């Protein structure tokens, strides 16, 4: 039940962030750019989580902490295409072809700007942190660059 509510909350946040009720056209980027984005986004989210745990995580056990790391990765997966809308806008504004460093900077900005502390507080205060399950462990054990996202163009 808790996981269902978490998924519904993520879906509502997706709709709120996208500000539209239509399909978000998929944007595809090269693997090197994808890796740079994922590493920086997850690093930013994890830094936020470490700070949040230091201030608010006293009542959480080890498995609940691991679930919050899972929330970071799942949040990135859920919102990947919305990030791509913003990233395409930013890379087009450069006036030159983007390089990996540009994508690293954009990923770091996403990881820094999104207030994940709000979600951690929401889950903790409403006792909605789900049990730590095997699929969460599999995603947490992946390196950030290996976390799957919707970036594979089926036509290529």
Swiss-Prot record:
Coiled coil start-end: none
Originating species: Haliotis cracherodii
Record localization: Cytoplasmic vesicle, Secretory vesicle, Acrosome lumen
Complex formation: Monomer. Homodimer. Molecules associate into dimers and then rapidly dissociate again. Interacts (as a monomer) with the egg vitelline layer protein VERL (via VERL repeats); each VERL chain can bind multiple copies of lysin.
Entry superkingdom: Eukaryota
GO cellular component labels: acrosomal lumen
UniProt protein name: Egg-lysin
GO biological process, one term: single fertilization
Tissues in which the UniProt entry reports expression: Sperm.
Functional note: Creates a 3 um hole in the egg vitelline layer through which the sperm passes. Does not have enzyme activity. Species-specific interaction between the sperm protein lysin and the egg protein VERL exposes a basic surface on lysin that may dissociate the egg vitelline layer via electrostatic repulsion. Plays a role in ensuring species-specific fertilization.
Entry-linked InterPro entries: Egg_lysin, Egg_lysin_sf
Cross-referenced SUPFAM superfamilies: Fertilization protein
Keywords: Cytoplasmic vesicle, Fertilization, Signal
Signal peptide positions (record): 1-18
